[in-house]
């Protein structure tokens, strides 16, 4: 660095003495007049313009910027002392190609010299000549040299004359496709088209066969014309797997030429450089000498002055071929500056002033390589979508800096808008270290520090390159990216903070994302979490299970003295009272207290049933993640889930392998006890669920769903003998525990005594578990009767979450058995604290609380037999539709519907079938008799029809006739177990499909969620990809968002806490958006949120639906430049449909399917946003 500072210091000193005459370089060097430059205009934009402005400022030179109408907000115009608009009314690129405007600005503002930067006019001889004709110096080679070097065919001829080896190719630009055919016939494939008047990858296309020739010729010509104003092409033999090595040269007006060694630019995509290295690693010294000497020789051949680059291909045998000269500064000039300590822009300006290289202290023998430098081009491109350019507003920009890191950027800042009009380069990151691995480490660290939000970037891809062993070894060629597909295994950025801000802003603008049934706000205060002792929780029944296995666990339960309790607060209680809406956030907060205080519980019911799909559908949480997190917090108490037999946790039948895999993965994630039931007590379904749970290593708890009344001799269908017979079958099948599942709360104390004592007498060694609901108000009495009759376990809920359609009170059972042989051992004072927490938590869910419409339970449940959760739902639905006064009729219809279907056992999904039929009868004003009489003409609910077809199994006593025959007519009927005929689901294929659909690592848990609920899972993944980890938000923020000026904290993980303050919401803009302002960790953040209500009244181009294969969307924002098909056209898979242009690159959109074009939604020259619908194929 000392040498670097010395050289730059000397250059600044020279700037001060601008009025003096240059000292002679040597006695034999010809003398030129020194003309100091006082004002420089950069005929370019972006980071290269700023790079030149900075150099000029260091030399005391005034700077002038030019900008297009589209660049009014770009940083380069602000970095200059003066800035002027050019190309008014022209297309974005054409503005910077408009020579008359640029010369006019230079003349009118007394500009001494023009720096062309790179790209645009930098290699146009007519521009260099126009500057010279106007009396303005061109900081670069003479117009004649620019013309010769810019014409790649002439440059090739010069190289041949200089004795520099070249690649076989045409001697002049080709003018027709026919000439390309002739060259291919002579030299064979592969060949490459190259733009004759520019580089940077534009106008380059590799062709491997005659079939590809015409399309690639057309595209290359079009790209060259758009980028350089001239579509001329030449064609060369394509050398496969070469290294791309370029040599930096520098010349003065005195004939001095020197080189600054080489750069390795082999890491390319579509012939565009991605990562550049200086010097080239593991380059043979003799090859380096040949490359540098040939470069100097070629420069001397044409009298080259100023900075330039000579590019070569080096084949695998070490033979080099000249390909072109870039008569300008290169994008990657930075790495050469870092390793040679030479400021190339300073040198360019001084040479243009008339100084000699020796004057500047630049002699070949003094140029030494110091360490290694790497440059990464951070672009707004999406590597996961073939590097398609992304556009939009940068919401967050934080760069990586530190020792050995240099950043060259332009409009890389929060609030900057990335348009589709220009190059996608965001910032150049340059790392300098003592050697290649050190520079790579510094670069990797710097990129890891970057935070860019609002647009996609290629940073994840660059990080993969930097960590690649081949790259670290330094031996790469131009096929490096193509031959390392693992580079595209991208780790998605978590981006949690910004996603959460998007969610909060969305809720603030549009309201809750989950349907809110009641207009009630969450409690403004958080529930109080009781004090938790320090240290691990005491041992519990799970420790026995882990030590002795399911059989040993069952023995321990049976041998336990006193009554055991299962707490349903984490699942069934809130399913019954709060529409299953309790979030993981609130479950986690109380979990450590439960682990420490209730270690004597038999189990905690916390998973399965409706909680699985509701978590994804309405709470936007992963149910598996809930299980994993709760397991970590409660290691000592067994977890229990509700498994719907062959239906697992869904509402339909699944292939057997899905049910088995589900149980296996649930067990791996921490589930212990599988309470297996079937809504019809259909034995084949029960046995399948039991087998799946048992094979997974879980505790099998077979559950008999209870209905009727065994204490009533007149109720003969579901008699004591029925239940005893079914119990015999389940015990014979190997259940570890037997459960009576009383989902409606129909067990009266007398019936409890009869049923439980009979089971205890028949199965003295088998643990008995009783589940009920407290709808009638007799739940506590019933559970006490069960306990006295010999039950080992009964279900309870926290006091504040008990009663009504939930389970009986935990505190009541604990108090009633205290000091008796049935003592639960649960500390009553801990129950009080637990209840207080849930009382506070329940207030957060006021919008879902059943007490909004239902004030008490009702003993009429003994007549209508409606299950607890369904009773709550039906009651609320009736009131929400203004039919609260008719709820009695709904209950009456439920009784009639049940009898009409043959008196079913009613639990999900059979209870839903009865409920659907009941509502159908009420809505149509039908009695049971009328519905049965008109059965052949009525359109019954789908669930009823499928039940009668046998899709959920066969009910006890068979299907009701003649109703079944009347309804089904000729519809097919399922014989036997419904899932038995289903072929196994290809889970590996599903995993592959999900990976393609969601573009990230898919877990076995994800696969099973998608197998159970494909549409719900897809929506959940899309939602969380947009809005992030919502379970870190407290429930009030989740439901209604923050108030303006509210400050709060969000803990993402241990040690990572966000400090957020909501600041303001803007008025509606023309795009139907509102800007929402936050303060995040002390920094201002703003996001744009679509106002969904306002947008209903505005017209926007339709978006392609990702799940509809025939809908073809724009892969990137851009302009339609060609449409290749029309409505009615037949297309094949892979056939080009249209061509988009963005950031000076063209992309051909191809058909993903075979079919017929139904409708074309775009026209030529239309500007599209990403995913805008292009056309539909059917």
From Swiss-Prot:
ATP binds at residues 152, 236, 271. Coiled coil: none annotated. Residues 156-353 form the ATP-grasp domain. It is an enzyme of class 6 (ligase). Residues 563-832 form the Pyruvate carboxyltransferase domain. The modification N6-acetyllysine is found at residues 35, 39, 79, 148, 152, 241, 297, 319, 434, 589, 661, 717, 748, 892, 969, 992, 1061, 1090, 1124. Residues 36-486 form the Biotin carboxylation domain. This is Pyruvate carboxylase, mitochondrial. It comes from Bos taurus.
């Amino acid at each position: 660095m000392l040498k670097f500072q010395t050289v730059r210091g000397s250059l600044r000193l020279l700037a001060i003495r601008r009025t003096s005459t240059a000292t002679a370089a040597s006695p034999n060097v010809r003398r030129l007049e020194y003309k100091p430059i006082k004002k420089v205009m950069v005929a370019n934009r972006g980071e290269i313009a700023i790079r030149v402005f900075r150099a000029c400022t260091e030399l005391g030179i005034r700077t002038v910027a030019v900008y297009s109408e589209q660049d009014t907000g770009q940083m380069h115009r602000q970095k200059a002392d003066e800035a002027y608009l050019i190309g008014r009314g022209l297309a974005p690129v054409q503005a910077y190609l408009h020579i008359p405007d640029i010369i006019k600005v230079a003349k009118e503002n007394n500009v001494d010299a023009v720096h062309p930067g790179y790209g645009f006019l930098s290699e146009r001889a007519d521009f260099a000549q126009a500057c010279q004709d106007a009396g303005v110096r061109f900081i670069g080679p003479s117009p004649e040299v620019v013309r010769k070097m810019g014409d790649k065919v002439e440059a090739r001829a010069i190289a041949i004359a200089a004795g520099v080896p070249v690649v076989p190719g045409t001697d002049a630009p080709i003018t027709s496709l026919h000439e390309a055919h002739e060259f291919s016939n002579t030299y064979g494939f592969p060949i490459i088209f190259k733009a004759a008047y520019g580089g940077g990858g534009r106008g380059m296309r590799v062709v491997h066969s005659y079939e590809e020739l015409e399309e690639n010729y057309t595209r290359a010509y079009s790209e060259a014309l758009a980028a350089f104003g001239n579509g001329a092409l030449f064609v060369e033999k394509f050398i496969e797997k070469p290294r791309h090595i370029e040599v930096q040269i520098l010349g003065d007006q005195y004939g001095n030429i020197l080189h600054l060694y080489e750069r390795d630019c082999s890491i390319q995509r579509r012939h565009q450089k991605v990562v550049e290295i200086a010097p080239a690693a593991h380059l043979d010294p003799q090859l380096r000498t040949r490359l540098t000497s040939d470069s100097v020789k070629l420069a001397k051949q044409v009298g080259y002055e100023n900075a330039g680059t000579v590019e070569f291909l080096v084949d695998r045998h070490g033979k080099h071929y000249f390909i072109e000269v870039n008569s300008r500064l290169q994008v990657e000039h930075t790495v050469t500056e870092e390793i040679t300590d030479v400021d190339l822009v300073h040198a360019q300006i001084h040479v243009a002033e008339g100084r000699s290289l020796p004057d500047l202290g630049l002699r070949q023998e003094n140029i030494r390589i110091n360490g290694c430098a790497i440059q990464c081009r951070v672009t707004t491109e999406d590597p996961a979508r073939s590097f398609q350019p992304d556009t939009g507003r940068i919401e967050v920009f934080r760069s990586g800096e530190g020792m050995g890191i240099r950043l060259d950027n332009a409009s890389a800042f929060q609030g900057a808008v990335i348009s589709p009009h220009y190059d996608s380069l965001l910032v150049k990151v340059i790392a300098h270290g003592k050697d290649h691995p050190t520079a790579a480490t510094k670069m990797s660290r710097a990129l890891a520090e970057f935070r860019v939000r609002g647009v996609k970037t290629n940073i994840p891809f660059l990080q993969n390159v930097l960590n690649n062993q081949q790259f670290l070894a330094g031996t790469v060629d131009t096929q490096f990216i193509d031959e390392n597909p693992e580079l595209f295994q991208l780790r998605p950025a978590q981006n949690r903070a910004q996603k959460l801000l998007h969610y909060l802003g969305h809720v603030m603008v549009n309201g809750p994302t989950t349907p809110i049934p009641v207009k009630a706000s969450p409690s403004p205060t958080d529930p109080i979490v009781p004090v938790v002792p320090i240290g691990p929780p005491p041992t519990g029944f799970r420790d026995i299970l882990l030590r002795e296995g399911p059989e040993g666990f069952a023995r321990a339960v049976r041998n336990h003295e006193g009554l055991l309790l299962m707490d349903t607060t984490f699942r069934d209680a809130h399913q019954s009272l709060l529409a299953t809406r309790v979030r993981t956030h609130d479950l986690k907060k109380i979990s450590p207290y439960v682990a420490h205080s209730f270690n004597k519980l038999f189990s905690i019911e916390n998973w399965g049933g409706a909680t699985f799909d509701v978590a994804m559908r309405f709470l936007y949480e992963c149910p598996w993640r809930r299980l994993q997190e709760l397991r970590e917090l409660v290691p000592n108490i067994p977890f229990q889930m509700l498994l719907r037999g062959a239906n697992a946790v869904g509402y339909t039948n699944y292939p057997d392998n899905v049910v088995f895999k589900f149980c296996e993965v649930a067990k791996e994630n921490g589930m212990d006890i599988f309470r297996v039931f079937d809504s019809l007590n259909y034995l084949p379904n029960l046995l399948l669920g039991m087998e799946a749970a048992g094979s997974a290593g879980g505790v099998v708890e077979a559950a008999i769903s209870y209905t009727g009344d065994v204490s009533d001799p007149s109720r003969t269908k579901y008699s004591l003998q029925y239940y005893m017979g079914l119990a015999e079958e389940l015990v014979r099948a190997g259940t570890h525990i037997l459960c009576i599942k009383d989902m409606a709360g129909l067990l009266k104390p007398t019936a409890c005594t009869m049923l439980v004592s009979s089971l205890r007498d028949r199965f003295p060694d088998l643990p008995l578990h009783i589940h009920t609901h407290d709808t009638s108000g007799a739940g506590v009495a019933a559970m006490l009767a069960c306990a006295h009759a010999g039950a080992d376990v009964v279900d309870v809920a926290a006091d504040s979450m008990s009663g009504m359609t939930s389970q009986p009170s935990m505190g009541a059972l604990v108090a009633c058995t205290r000091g008796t042989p049935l003592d639960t051992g649960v500390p009553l004072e801990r129950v009080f604290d637990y209840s207080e927490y849930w009382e506070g938590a329940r207030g957060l869910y006021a919008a879902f609380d059943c007490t909004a419409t239902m004030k008490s339970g009702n003993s009429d449940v003994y007549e209508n037999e409606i299950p607890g959760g369904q009773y709550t739902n039906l009651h609320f639905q009736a009131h929400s539709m203004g039919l609260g006064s008719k709820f009695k009729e709904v209950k009456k219809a439920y009784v009639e519907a049940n009898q009409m279907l043959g008196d079913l056992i009613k639990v999900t999904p059979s209870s839903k079938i009865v409920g659907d039929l009941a509502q159908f009868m009420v809505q149509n004003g039908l009695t049971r008799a009328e519905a049965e009489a008109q059965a052949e003409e009525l359109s019954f609910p789908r669930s009823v029809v499928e039940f009668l077809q046998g899709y959920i199994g066969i009910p006890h006593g068979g299907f009701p006739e003649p109703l079944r025959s009347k309804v089904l007519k000729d519809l097919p009927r399922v014989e036997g177990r419904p899932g038995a005929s289903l072929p196994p689901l290809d889970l590996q294929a599903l995993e592959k499909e999900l990976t393609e659909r969601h573009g990230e690592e898919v877990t076995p848990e994800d696969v099973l969620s998608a197998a159970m609920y494909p549409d719900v899972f897809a929506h959940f993944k899309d939602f969380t990809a947009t809005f992030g980890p919502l379970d870190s938000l407290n429930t009030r923020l989740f439901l209604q968002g923050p108030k303006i000026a509210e400050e709060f904290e969000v803990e993402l993980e241990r040690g990572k806490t966000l400090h957020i303050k909501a600041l303001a919401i803007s008025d509606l803009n023309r795009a139907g958006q509102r800007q929402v302002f936050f303060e995040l960790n002390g920094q201002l953040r703003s996001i744009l949120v679509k106002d969904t209500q306002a947008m209903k009244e505005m017209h926007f181009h339709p978006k392609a639906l990702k799940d509809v294969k025939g809908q073809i969307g724009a892969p990137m924002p851009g302009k339609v430049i060609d449409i290749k098909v029309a409505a009615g056209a037949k297309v094949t898979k892979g056939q080009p449909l249209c061509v988009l242009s963005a950031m000076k690159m063209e992309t051909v959109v191809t058909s993903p399917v075979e079919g017929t074009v139904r409708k074309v939604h775009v026209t030529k020259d239309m500007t599209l946003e990403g995913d805008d619908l292009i056309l539909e194929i059917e």
